[in-house]
Amino acid sequence: MAMPNLGDMMKQIQQAGEKMQEVQKQLERLVAHGEAGGGMVKATVSGKQKLLSLAIDPEIMDDYEMVQDLVVAAVNSALDASLKLAQDEIGKVTGGMMNPTELLKNLNLGQ
């Protein structure tokens, strides 16, 4: 049984590390949007799953419970869109070398 070439293994590890750094940079640049209530509440999140902005139509501010529900729905929609963008970007950057879902878990993103 042939032993794996240590040099090749080290090169693959180095390439994987470089790909991870590239993925991190790409995730920082990604922006995703979500909305609820027909656009009455809009959320924007980064590729690293951070809420960047939240816009609420002033006309709905009197209905506290509805605002709460719509904010949650809009943020969750934006987070879902962000995960999808991140998975797509990981696939592009790694050329299929890495499983996007597992990589996002390793980066503490996604579920």
Curated annotation (Swiss-Prot):
Subunit text: Homodimer.
NCBIfam families assigned: DNA_YbaB_EbfC
Disulfide bond entries: none
Top-rank taxon: Bacteria
Molecular-function GO terms, alphabetical: DNA binding
Listed name of the protein: Nucleoid-associated protein Cag_1190
InterPro entries reported for this sequence: YbaB-like_sf (IPR036894), YbaB/EbfC (IPR004401)
Function: Binds to DNA and alters its conformation. May be involved in regulation of gene expression, nucleoid organization and DNA protection.
Annotated Gene3D superfamilies: Nucleoid-associated protein YbaB-like domain (3.30.1310.10)
Annotated compartments: Cytoplasm, Nucleoid
A Gene Ontology term for the protein's cellular component: cytosol
Keywords: Cytoplasm, DNA-binding
Family: Belongs to the YbaB/EbfC family.
Location, primary (coarse class): cytoplasm
Lineage: Bacteria, Pseudomonadati, Chlorobiota, Chlorobiia, Chlorobiales
